[in-house]
Amino acid sequence: MSQPRQQQVPPGATAGMVPRPDHGEHSYRGSGRLAGKAAVITGGDSGIGRAVAIAYAREGADVLLSYLNEHEDAQETARWVRDAGRTCVLVPGDLADPAHCRSVIDKAVEAFGRVDVLVSNAAYQMTRDSITDIPDEEWDRTLAINLSAFFHLTKAAVPHMRPGSAIIGSTSVNSDSPPPQLLPYDVTKAGIANMVGSLAQMLASKGIRANSVAPGPIWTPLIPATMPPEQVESFGSEVPLGRPGQPAELAPVYVMLASDEAAYVSGARIAVTGGQPIL
């Protein structure tokens, strides 16, 4: 299975993707598993974040979506959330700025009075063949958005989280099997996995759980926006299932980790990789 060669300008947009990703718009059915919860989802405009937002809303949660500047995608995601009868707050801005991370949480508390679920999902990457090709500012930005923002968001959110709340970090199969062309991204995803392990222990006494999801190759706007067209064409073909995953195929895992069903699940990393193992 392959996609046609295509290229977008970062950070990418859903509308230009062929084929269009499946976020569960027409398939996800909720059953009240997150009824009454308030969730913050970064990178919530598209890709995995959109699929999680749709699933959370259909499970009964209100949602704040943090995103950079992809307003069209964000508005479409918000429409799906509101169609489910839930509140959706949109907060654009750059998570590389610690002050903006704090502002995201402040706006969630203003809207909902608390944070029950924090999903740190926003990510940045670029493909480079050599370490000498990586600009210093690209290294810094990748770490700031992918890893440091997770720290700043969590630090700001914890005082507003009650026992039973959940923190979920989006890591990657790359934390175990790092492709050399994504060096800064690989580093951040390993860092998220380790941060989650520390948070699970640090926050246990507060009744707050921390877990991560390790996706394999998932068909999101980040792919045509950050990879050469020939890599886009074969994206996902290397895993045992022979295809990229769809965002909708990850959403149920994020729902489970946010739900009370996962009350004893903390410090875990769940792989959704199309058969590629993580250790």
PLM feature segments, named:
Residues R29, I134, P178-V187, S198:
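Active-site loop-to-helix junction immediately N-terminal to the catalytic Tyr of the SDR YXXXK motif
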Residues A204, R209, V265-G267:
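Short, small/polar-rich loop/turn modules that mediate ligand/substrate recognition or access, typified
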Residues H71, P92-I105, D136, A248-E249:
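The beta1-alpha1 cofactor-binding region of Rossmann-like NAD(H)/NADP(H)-dependent oxidoreductases
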Residues D129-I131, P135-L143, F235:
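Substrate-binding pocket helix/loop in short-chain dehydrogenase/reductase
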Residues A193, A214-A225:
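Short, flexible catalytic-loop segment of classical short-chain dehydrogenase/reductase
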Residues T154, T188, V196:
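Active-site helix of classical SDR
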Residues P4, M17, E25-H26, R128, ...:
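Short C-terminal tail/terminal secondary-structure segment
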